């Protein structure tokens, strides 16, 4: 079966990295595709002997046609995965300061921050129809490639679940569909022999086993997610991102995220586990 990937997102969020990775995987890649030739390009691809194609759409694609409507029509006809990349404004400002590149909307006296927010609004429609939204704020190139690999492997069908532990003091993940707050639970950070360990450690696990409220909370989250995931599968949603947060993202959220992964995998769901802030102080 022919496979099509559409990559879009904010300038500076990683589209170039994503397209380079897709090219390495053998995809025929076309960058900055104007909206008025998307469907014509699809026809050429479908009649060719190529098996995989990736198309990048950014804010400049709107100048020639409506790329979003074209992508919606393509999704109805083909096995297409739409990936949207974003990052926090603060991180995008930092990246632009490092590269000293000019934002595509930064003209007529408009500042960089205003250009970023304008682009966010313009691309909000394509974010809404994306199968996968990836927040690259805390990712390096390797982590982005690893995340893309997971979604591409599972492109053939079904709903994948991405469970991410995080620390509220480091910010809530922008791409989370669900966020659960574990800060009310007992905290092993205040136990001297457990403070330096993580929620993946057997001694921390034993600590949580002493508190029935922890398991009760996990069971409640599991029940909610099971209903939601099954409904997402029915409607064709490709990915659900679940954020589990505690104060620092090292103990409670990590333990709960890992337990939920184990429980959901037993039900046959495809799950990717990520601990965003586990190495942070």
Swiss-Prot record:
Supply the alphabetized keyword list: ATP-binding, GTP-binding, Nucleotide-binding
Q: Which domain of life is it from?
A: Bacteria
Residues the record lists as binding GTP: 58-61
Please list the residues that bind ATP.
9-16
Residue ranges crossing the lipid bilayer per the database entry: none
State the HAMAP family in the record. Answer: RapZ_like
Name of this protein: Nucleotide-binding protein TRQ2_1124
**What species was this sequence derived from?**
Thermotoga sp. (strain RQ2)
Lineage start: Bacteria, Thermotogati, Thermotogota, Thermotogae, Thermotogales
């Amino acid at each position: 079966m022919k496979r099509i990937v559409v990559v879009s997102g904010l300038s500076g969020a990683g589209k170039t990295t994503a397209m380079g990775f897709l090219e390495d995987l053998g995809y025929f890649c076309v960058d900055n595709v104007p909206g008025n030739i998307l469907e014509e390009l699809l026809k050429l691809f479908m009649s060719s002997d190529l098996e995989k194609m990736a198309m990048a759409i950014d804010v400049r694609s709107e100048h020639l046609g409506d790329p979003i409507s074209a992508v919606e029509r393509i999704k109805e006809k083909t096995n297409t995965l739409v990936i949207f990349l974003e990052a926090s404004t603060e991180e995008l400002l930092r990246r632009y300061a490092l590269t000293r590149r000019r934002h595509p909307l930064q003209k007529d006296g408009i500042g960089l921050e205003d250009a970023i927010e304008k682009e966010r609004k313009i691309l909000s429609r394509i974010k809404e129809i994306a199968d996968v939204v990836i927040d690259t704020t805390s990712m390096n190139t390797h982590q982005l490639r690893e995340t893309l690999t997971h979604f591409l492997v599972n492109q053939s069908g079904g709903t994948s679940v991405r469970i991410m532990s995080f620390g509220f003091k480091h910010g809530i993940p922008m791409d989370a569909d669900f966020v659960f707050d574990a800060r009310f639970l007992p905290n092993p950070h205040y136990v001297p022999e457990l403070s330096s360990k993580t929620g993946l450690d057997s001694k921390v696990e034993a600590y949580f086993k002493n508190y029935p409220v922890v398991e009760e909370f996990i069971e409640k989250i599991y029940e909610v997610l099971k209903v939601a995931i099954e409904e997402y599968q029915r409607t064709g949603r490709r990915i659900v991102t679940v954020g589990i947060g505690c104060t620092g993202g090292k103990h409670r959220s990590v333990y709960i995220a890992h337990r939920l992964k184990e429980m959901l995998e037993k039900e046959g769901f495809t799950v990717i586990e990520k601990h965003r802030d586990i190495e942070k102080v």
